[in-house]
């Protein structure tokens, strides 16, 4: 039996240390149903690829905005899935009077997306997939609401690329979560070591969730219960392995992040960067922040998966960002003479 959305909106978003014993018991008794997408989105989409369904489909989850609202397009990072943003969505919905909608997409070679070839993970290809999927949803549902692009890690690089290139109509804002060109490029040298120390399989989903918590990949157990199952696929012997082979993406790592800071700063929309610490900033973004070119938010109590660790804070930042970037409509001047045509 799935959680009611009302229960989720009341209990999902505190840090684990802040959760009551009742909340923890409710969570542990319902871990399997927590990962059901229906708790967080209204629709599941199967979007044909740019060349049609012959080369596979893109998996997405959608909740439509109200006519005077906006659509947040949520793109996860490498090795993650669209469900990475699920802990945020109910808080967004309940605090926006249902005005905000959201579209979360599985990247190529991730989640339930089946696009081929899965080996092509270049930033250009991923950005084309992203643009195609968003444009398809805009046409299919006749959406003309403003769009804010929100991306975590690699997803942030994709969103920055598309914002800089202006590939998605009606975009009004760009939010990048915990990815900066300089620090990302430095971290790439340690990625293969990290991957080699990571388990290749788990006996159960619960073991995988426990590993994510123990290693601080995710610092919120409830979020881990929601997001981790979509990262794994079950083998014939009953064990669970990673859906995405991150080793195979290594030829593209430099390509993903090169020029990211410049693209972010030159995107012609409102910009917000959310990071886990000031040490994440590189020189370009430090100078840009001092010049007031973007909004900077620092959440030091979090790890790399900021939006999973503190979803309530992320949802609050996103809603405030949306309100600040809405077009200003000025009232007519008092006593102004109407112009006759």
From Swiss-Prot:
Region listing for Disordered, in residue ranges: 1-24
Gene3D superfamilies (alphabetical): alpha/beta hydrolase (3.40.50.1820)
Enzyme class: hydrolase
Segments of skewed composition (Polar residues): 9-20
EC number: 3.1.1.89
InterPro entries documented for this protein: AB_hydrolase_1, AB_hydrolase_fold, PPase_methylesterase_euk
One Pfam entry name: Abhydrolase_6
Active site as annotated: 153, 178, 304
BP-aspect Gene Ontology terms: cellular detoxification; protein repair
GO CC annotation: cytosol; nucleus
Catalytic activity: [phosphatase 2A protein]-C-terminal L-leucine methyl ester + H2O = [phosphatase 2A protein]-C-terminal L-leucine + methanol + H(+)
GO molecular function annotations of the record: protein C-terminal methylesterase activity
UniProtKB keywords: Hydrolase, Serine esterase
Function: Demethylates proteins that have been reversibly carboxymethylated. Demethylates the phosphatase PP2A catalytic subunit.
Family: Belongs to the AB hydrolase superfamily.
PANTHER family: PROTEIN PHOSPHATASE METHYLESTERASE 1, PROTEIN PHOSPHATASE METHYLESTERASE-1 RELATED
Record's protein name: Protein phosphatase methylesterase 1
